[in-house]
Amino acid sequence: MTDTPSPKALNKAADDRIALYEALLSLRTREEVDAFLSDLCTPSELRAFAERWAVARLLDQQAQSYREIALAAGASPTTVVRVARFLKDMQHQGYRLVLDRLKTKA
């Protein structure tokens, strides 16, 4: 017996993710995003998201060491390394997409 999800379970998980993405895309203001994420996530999850985003922004500035970034963001060195890896090497490039988009907006 294996713990491998069935194709039906995998399809449902994919459908659920798409539904979540559509819900996020429907939000129009910071207040709406705050209300939705506050309902969806625990306070700890929101803090973790905000911490990783702070780390990504600091890494993008390339002005501090990983240790300094960890201290400034209140993150663990492991979190800094993980975010740095996603920022540089991962195929999704979600951090990079948003960082670049926000730079052009400023």
Annotate each language-model stretch with its function.
Residues M1-L27:
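General nucleic-acid-binding
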Residues E32, S44-E45, D60-A63, K88:
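Short alpha-helix boundary/capping elements
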Residues V33-R52:
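Short, Lys/Arg-enriched anionic-surface-contact patches
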Residues F49-Q64:
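Short, amphipathic alpha-helical "recognition" segments used to contact nucleic acids or chromatin
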Residues E68-G74:
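Short alpha-helical "recognition helix" segments of helix-turn-helix
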Residues T79-V80:
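Helix-turn-helix DNA-binding helix
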Residues A84-L87, Q91:
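DNA major-groove recognition helix of helix-turn-helix
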Residues Q93, L97-A106:
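Intrinsically disordered, low-complexity basic tails/linkers immediately adjacent to helix-turn-helix/homeobox/MYB/SANT
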